[in-house]
Amino acid sequence: MSVSLTDKLVVAISSRALFDFEEENRVFEAGDLGAYEQLQRERLNVPARPGVAFGLMRKLLALNTGAHHVEVVILSRSDPISGLRAFSSCREHGLNIQRGVFTRGRTPWHYLKPLNASLFLSANPDDVRAALEAGFPAARVFPRVFPRPDANSATMSAASADRNANEIRIAFDGDAVLFSDEAEQIFQQQGLGAFVSHERDNRDLPLAHGPLQPLLAALHRLQKLADGNAQNMRIRTALVTARSAPAHERAIRTLMAWNIEIDEAMFLGGLEKGPFLREFEPDFFFDDQIRHCESARSVTATGHVALGAANAAPGLATASHTTADTRAP
């Protein structure tokens, strides 16, 4: 019987998002592929430390108790020999990851289709943008900012796992992440007043799917399975958005139309998201705006969804910060 991943939540993740390969990556990005490969060979038997998204992957794989619901695949620009170190690091850390694709410097996102991936996490912004523009759910993993000099991704992943050992917590921005950027375009082109009027007038019309809607839908299915099967690991989701009333109504009605339930919704009206994320304690947070990612990355692992009106041109997301604090996404 042929093997298929069609009924699984498939997460494709780069080796640098999964493990701390920052030192090796500096050699790679310097353009000396031979020196990079030699460095990886020298460290072949040295397990890499956990990276930014390690904690989330470990918890997602814990959902496979009793049945195989989640597949994590390493999808990397590294060469196949460097892939040996990635797999041995998985084994050392107890991650049951069995599949990987290594492209030796070529962009790897084309393999998302045969993998049927519900999410692609990478530290490479070009790969993420290419995947998003091709219609695949993807996010650029932001480097963590640590509150203490002695902290790193490994210690922070461990601390997060210990805090909520039996619960996967994932937080999403709304517009241009879960939802399309339709409302964001109104704001960018016509201003806050037009945005509020547009959302109030269209409150009964569901928004179109955003790039990470497939991930939320897959998590919702797993959430129902976990609740029904008395799984030890639970899933809890949150919508963390700069929308406020009356624009909140269309967001909730859209989720209702999709038959997707979320556990928490925060309509912040431009307040900084970081303090609210600190209370929710997510394992991962997704947002389309650099500003919100910067606010969040000292609190949690963060992914930038570089698509939509806020990312339409270089510098646009940053340039709009002073005016975007009271609007939709």
Annotate the PLM regions.
Residues 1-11, 127-170, 174-178, 182-201, ...:
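Asp-based, Mg2+/Mn2+-dependent phosphohydrolase catalytic module
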Residues 2-106, 173-267:
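Alpha-helical substrate-recognition element adjacent to the catalytic core
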Residues 20, 26-29, 40-41, 45, ...:
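A cross-kingdom feature marking solvent-exposed beta-strand/loop segments within repeated
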